[in-house]
């Protein structure tokens, strides 16, 4: 037996079909647990009426999907838990195939079948079984999923994406700096750092209505998919910068949805004739020594970051690696941006305790040791 853990934020319309699919298509007699982050659509009452176990957000502010999963994993009465989304429909026996591939120290993801809203990819199947929960072609989907499961039995990949199954004793905890965007990118890369086995089962299938609680939240008609939710776009931008601050760069992949941890270095920059464009690269840096005012930049970041950005600005750099540039020199900003965006490749070209010039940029390398990323995060408030 496993526990399907489903975060919900005013997702009752989708949650009904999601839970129906788990109840009808599970191979095992499984538990269902819902984390209600926000309820303005009668979610809690419906769960009570249908005797579905749930946890409610204790605060008025939304906690986010990561907090929800951590809370549900802790409350689960089974060790095997599945991180599921409210806009997903479970395929026949999908749970059996997840369990079949699982061992301690592994994370097993199902394969998504999606309607044609996003570009196709080698890690998923694009096929339309309905765009809305009320229009799901249940018989067609179940028949297709059964046939695909049989045809792909034993076929495995390395993609990581919800839904994913794990023994809750192996869970590393979500980082609270990522509210509901990039939280999985961060977690999956820590799974890889912990040397977990990342598995995708092509026999375990779900139909994913695609981001109805995120970038397409509130979509009511097809035209709504032409524009992403404004709140999601804002959260995505904020979380992207937080990811860069933590990991040292944008997230990387070995293949589509195959997480590759970043290699972060301790980097500072000394900048003459500093500009706002230079300051905007702050997320890539641990320290900055500049000759311009950075008050306005700090104001633009206020309340958006869990990092102490103000303390990054110093009079003397103490980082392992120091980059020096004159922002007034031709091409310096382009070189600076390129070096920071490709820092792992740059570090492959240099030796420690050496100085190098890349165009108008000077790099002084002291220690060339990666920064250790904290792998396990547990919220003691849960």
Which residue ranges define each predicted feature?
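A conserved hydrophobic helix/loop-capping motif in glycosyltransferases and polysaccharide synthases
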Residues: 2-14, 18, 25-26, 268-274
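Short, acidic, metal-binding catalytic loop of nucleotide-sugar glycosyltransferases
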Residues: 20-29, 281-287
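A conserved acidic beta->alpha catalytic loop
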Residues: 35-45, 292-298
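Glycine-rich, basic loop-to-helix element that forms the pyrophosphate-binding segment
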Residues: 58-76
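Short beta-strand-to-loop acidic/aromatic patch adjacent to the donor-nucleotide binding site
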Residues: 78-91, 320-328
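Conserved donor NDP-sugar-binding/catalytic core segment of glycosyltransferases
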Residues: 89, 93-132
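A recurrent flexible, glycine/aromatic-enriched loop bordering the glycosyltransferase active site
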Residues: 141-166, 180, 230
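A short, conserved alpha-helix in the catalytic core of glycosyltransferases
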Residues: 157-164, 170, 178-205, 210
């Amino acid at each position: 037996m496993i526990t399907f853990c489903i975060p919900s934020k005013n997702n009752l319309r989708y949650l009904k079909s999601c839970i129906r699919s788990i109840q009808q298509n599970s191979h095992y007699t499984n538990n269902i647990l819902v984390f209600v982050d926000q309820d303005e659509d009668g979610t809690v009452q419906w769960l009570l009426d249908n005797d579905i176990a749930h946890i409610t957000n204790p605060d008025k502010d939304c906690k986010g999907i990561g907090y929800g999963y951590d809370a549900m994993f802790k409350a689960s009465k089974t060790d095997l838990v599945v991180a599921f989304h409210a806009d997903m429909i479970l395929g026949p026996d999908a749970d059996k195939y997840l369990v079949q591939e699982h061992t301690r120290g592994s994370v097993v993801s199902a394969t998504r079948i999606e309607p044609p809203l996003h570009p196709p990819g080698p890690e998923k199947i694009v096929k339309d079984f309905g765009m809305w929960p009320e229009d799901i072609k249940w018989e067609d989907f179940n028949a297709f999923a059964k046939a695909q499961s049989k045809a792909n039995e034993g076929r495995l990949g390395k993609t990581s994406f919800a839904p994913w199954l794990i023994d809750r004793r192996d869970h590393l905890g979500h980082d609270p700096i990522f509210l509901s965007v990039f939280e999985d990118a961060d977690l999956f890369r820590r799974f890889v750092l912990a040397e977990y086995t990342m598995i995708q089962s092509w026999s375990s299938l779900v139909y994913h209505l695609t981001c109805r609680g995120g970038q397409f939240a509130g979509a009511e008609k097809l035209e709504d998919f032409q524009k992403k939710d404004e709140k999601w776009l804002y959260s995505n931008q904020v979380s992207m910068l937080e990811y860069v601050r933590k990991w040292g760069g944008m997230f990387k992949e070995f293949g589509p949805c195959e997480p590759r941890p970043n290699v972060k270095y301790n980097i500072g920059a000394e900048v003459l004739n500093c500009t706002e464009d230079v300051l905007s690269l702050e997320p890539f840096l641990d320290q900055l020594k500049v000759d311009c005012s950075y008050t306005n930049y700090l104001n633009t970041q206020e309340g958006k970051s869990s990092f102490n950005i103000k303390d990054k600005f110093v009079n003397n750099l103490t980082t392992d690696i120091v980059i020096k540039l004159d922002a007034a020199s031709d091409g310096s900003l382009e070189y600076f941006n390129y070096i920071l965006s490709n820092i792992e490749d740059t570090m492959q070209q240099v030796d420690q305790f050496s100085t190098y010039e890349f165009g108008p940029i000077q790099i002084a390398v002291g220690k060339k040791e990666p920064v250790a990323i904290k792998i396990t995060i547990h919220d003691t408030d849960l």
